[in-house]
Amino acid sequence: MTYRLPFVAVILFVTAKHVVLALENANWIEASKTVPSDSTQTTRVAYRRITGGFNERFLRQLEKKPGVNDKRDEERANFFEAVFKNTLFNAFGYRSDAKAKLQDPNSNIFVNLLRRIFVWWAKNKPEFNKNADMHKEAMV
């Protein structure tokens, strides 16, 4: 047990550090949206306040500005979604096939656990159901 103690200590330290940094970041963002603090200064020329954070107008402009890589990001997301679905289909097949393989007494326990997760996840996904197209045609 003593050989795991440094590893656990490092994990706890890194987790605590991330939590502290996230809280500081959240406080900084929240402070930039509220009333300016005492540390704000005025310039001699324009008499406007200089704050350390982003103001709301700048953030709104960033939201409205179209991203250069929006289309590329969408294509990349669609590609990874297709790869994910193909990998799942190659691993488990249709949902009904995965249900049938769950009943097999010779199958691996770990693989059965993955199959159960897949069956639960794919219950509302028409691309993983064999009879989804037939149901659609019958309803039309």
From Swiss-Prot:
Coiled coil: none annotated. Its main location: secreted. It is found in: Secreted; Host nucleus; Host cytoplasm. Residues 1-22 form the signal peptide. The keyword Nucleotide-binding does not apply. Belongs to the RxLR effector family. This is Secreted RxLR effector protein 37. It comes from Plasmopara viticola. The gene is RXLR37.
